[in-house]
Regions:
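Conserved catalytic core of the tyrosine transesterase superfamily
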Residues: 1-175
Length: 175
């Protein structure tokens, strides 16, 4: 017998819906450029909001095209490929939208004192963009975790083994 939690599939967005979300972000202003890079990290690499909020320059190895970090939630190390579109979005943010600050966090607020985000603020900006995107949300949560589930669903559709998906998402076990 399954309990209710086990029998429900996590909500997720299709690849087209994720594309629509990304396409709906206004890249004509600094907040949009920043938010696009943040949402791309979540949608394409499956990073948790806490790991995006905590991302530092030292976590990005541009030469080897790798992001290495210690996950906030689990304390476990995680190494992911720095995908070309993700890298380009981060570079665009750093060159054209990031305020001048000595913070070692990649993503900072657009108003002084330019502090880094907390995970709730990252989740909040994802929610705002999901609501503005025009995506049909009935039965789907509007949060960053749903973007992680969406990545997992797409990987499953491409027959990526579950242990590999768990590793990508930084889960401790596949159960």
């Amino acid at each position: 017998p399954h309990n209710n939690r086990q029998s429900r599939l996590p909500s997720s967005y299709t690849a087209n819906e994720v594309k629509k979300l990304l396409d709906s972000i206004d890249l004509g202003n600094p907040c949009g450029i920043r938010d696009y890079a943040i949402i791309l990290l979540i949608a394409r690499l499956g990073l948790r909001s806490s790991d995006v909020a905590n991302l530092r320059f030292s976590n990005i190895d541009w030469e080897k095209e790798i992001i290495r970090l210690t996950q906030v939630k689990t304390g476990n190390p995680l190494e992911l490929p720095l995908l070309e579109d993700v890298g380009e979005a981060i570079i665009n943010y750093l060159k054209n939208a990031r305020p001048k600050t000595d913070s070692d966090h990649v993503f900072v607020r657009q108003v002084p004192p330019y502090t880094n985000f907390n995970p709730g603020a990252v989740g909040g900006l994802v929610r705002v963009h999901l609501q503005k995107s025009g995506i049909h949300h009935e039965g789907k949560k509007k949060d960053s975790h749903t973007l992680r589930h969406s990545l997992a669903s797409r990987l499953l559709e491409h027959e990526i083994p579950l242990p590999v998906i768990s590793e990508i998402l930084g889960h401790i076990t596949t159960e």
